[in-house]
Amino acid sequence: MQLFHLCLIISCSCPTVQASKLCLGWLWGMDIDPYKEFGASVELLSFLPSDFFPSIRDLLDTASALYREALESPEHCSPHHTALRQAILCWGELMNLATWVGSNLEDPASRELVVSYVNVNMGLKIRQLLWFHISCLTFGRETVLEYLVSFGVWIRTPPAYRPPNAPILSTLPETTVVRRRGRSPRRRTPSPRRRRSQSPRRRRSQSRESQC
């Protein structure tokens, strides 16, 4: 993201949509996926519709309410905290860019194109990044990855063969606990069956002794 801004500044003195697209194409040629090191991918996140992600303001408020102390700390807390810091700083720079364009670009049509591109395209990428790392810190990385896979399977399944409602991230930990609890009774079932099968034999032997 920071490289994107640097390239944009070098490309021309007046940032345009064409310059940003050229820059992004160069970055894509490097095959950089910000989710790879966390076990996910851009493709996996793309299964979630754009309106699934909260607004950037809501995500920033959530990050501040839950993790502000850790984000402002000079200590390294986790890779997710580091990624959150970078995403928040990057969005701040994008807002500065949009403000600069609004003040310095004379052509209204070009100005609208740049601001719209930043808000829609780059805004969605930042929303995805913020949501992913906040969710990993809140629910755990494995739970989030399980959710992404579950949602991807659900959305690609024809409506006639899938549940009416999509998976919900906050319910996955509860489902996991239920599964763990469900295994234990199966292990205990053999012993009561043996006791039940042995009890009639004892009764028969006792009745025979009494008859004798």
Curated annotation (Swiss-Prot):
State one molecular function term (GO).
structural molecule activity
Give a short account of its post-translational modification: Phosphorylated.
Q: Where is this region: 3 X 8 AA repeats of S-P-R-R-R-R-S-Q?
A: 184-206
Is this entry keyworded Disulfide bond?
Answer: yes
Where does the record place the region HBEAG?
Answer: 25-27
The annotated subunit structure for this chain is: Homodimerizes.
This protein is called: External core antigen
Taxonomy, top ranks, is: Viruses, Riboviria, Pararnavirae, Artverviricota, Revtraviricetes
